[in-house]
Amino acid sequence: DIADLASCDALVQRVHKEHGGCDFLVNNAGRSIRRGVINSFDRFHDFERTMQLNYFGALRLIMGFLPKMIERRRGHIINISSIGVLSNAPRFSAYVASKSALDSFSACAASEFLDKGIHFTTINMPLVRTPMIAPTKMYDSFPTISPEEAADLVCEAIRAKPKQIN
């Protein structure tokens, strides 16, 4: 549960103990809430929960794995973001803000760690046909990709190490 920071810390320790570190970290967890700001005045907890999962959980894993990556002078952190970050999708302010925070962190960190052999890639993932988008009927008319195509984008990121895939 990456929304639970203690759980993140336990995962990092387990990976270090059992595998000696992490070569590739793919942050793919996501919580999406479709609700306009005008309908969110009394729902601040939605923003907190979304940031906790989409940003702070991923950040906790990154901060946990980075020291060993630096020590080994290699590592690649791939953050699954959203095409919504590029389009500022209405009614998704909590989700887009959380993904934008991770995108901005990654862009800053990438320049700090490139000379240490650490790469960061942000994938601004299009809509993927998963249960997460199923309840939103308007997506039925939007172009989507399959989970297999999404996995191909992650494999391309691992192979080519670009800063961004749109």
Can you say where each PLM-predicted feature lies in the sequence?
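Residue(s) in the substrate-gating loop at a strand-loop-helix junction
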Residues: S82
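C-terminal helical subdomain
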Residues: T122, Y139-N166
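Active-site helix of classical SDR
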Residues: I62, S98
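Conserved mid-core segment of classical short-chain dehydrogenase/reductases
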Residues: D9, S32-E48, R91
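Active-site-adjacent segment of SDR/Rossmann-fold oxidoreductases
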Residues: S87, C108-H119
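Rossmann-fold cofactor-recognition segment
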Residues: D1-L5
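Conserved amphipathic alpha-helix within the SDR
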Residues: A6-G20
